[in-house]
């Protein structure tokens, strides 16, 4: 039960984390868990339970039946209504059990009170500063009175252009009020650095999921769901390239293809099933998601977090897309020396599926970068990086 603000007036928690933890998105919820886990190794931290106004529209079962687009959207969800409601319930249970949530739930009406209870607010990671992201709103730029330290950790702006035409002077003012700024992608760091006229150094740091090792995630993983060997296909959006790549690998390895429900409309589910892909629609919690990676014989993905968890669980994998210039994927694969795992669908027949990945070297590189990022994060929290 949420406590009233009045009962907390004299309480301060050291660090509050503000991120997309309430979305029905595996990467979003797990990066929130990973960043909380990392910070909690040295400090007291809780996730600020902020719910943007748009969330009921974005993640509710149905949208208002007031436009033709909404009607079409709702009709595609009706056949999956039980599965969608179950998935939302499983996500909420995961948050309640695995995330240390603030005792107050915030929204646009009381967001200005967030600063009353923390010495440091960490914003990020995920696409909290991507102005095109449907989840994004100005609260993630901390536009309220706050006497403590403002830190951003590996916020992603994705392909947003921070320009005079798109952004206001007020937004620049809010960004410059941060004591420490870091972005997930190098080009994003450069864009933001230019936008704030080089008034502060903008760092490029790892996604929080990569700050934790396989052992850290062990406590989250459920009992094995699929008993047979399988290829795991994971994309946030159903992709023809992903489907065809998974089918090809399935035929080569003589294994079925499984995926977990992310597309919550019947049209995309039918498209997957028509291609012989087995869609898990019941066991769809973030812990179940990790389960599919841990026990997969092979992973096919074009998702950033699909790639991240393939690396974390040391799985053979391939990133398949119509293009091979997604900076988020390129950055992480170059870091661990696996850029050759990012291919176009047209190249898959020439790809050596049996070539093993040297995870000893991969882990050395990943852990070295993670240690560096964690040290920078701790210094930012403590106030040693003000440039």
Label each PLM-derived region with a short phrase.
Residues 3-387:
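Active-site anion-handling motifs in enzyme catalytic cores
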